[in-house]
Amino acid sequence: MEGKLFLCPTPIGNLEDITQRVLNTLREVELIAAEDTRNSLNLLRHFSITTPMISYHQHNERERTEELIGRLKDGLQLALITDAG
């Protein structure tokens, strides 16, 4: 069974502006791919989300894309978040 990729927008300013649906998704997926893990870690800690996270940005996009597509084909549930928005 193929996995699913969830595109999860994050708040630009106030962390409390995130939707409950996004919070649920971030808790339920197996892995979070984040543009900047330092910024994203603040969000995850604020909401006590312990899902594993990896970096995914313009400098590692080629390598990570192949890796993530392979993991999605293996059934991984993955959320992709950016720094803000």
What are the language-model segments listed below?
Residues 46, 71-74:
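Alpha-helix C-cap/termination motif
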Residues 1-59:
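Glycine-rich, flexible N-terminal cofactor/catalytic loop recognition
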Residues 25, 67-71:
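CheY-like receiver
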Residues 73-85:
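Short glycine-cluster motifs
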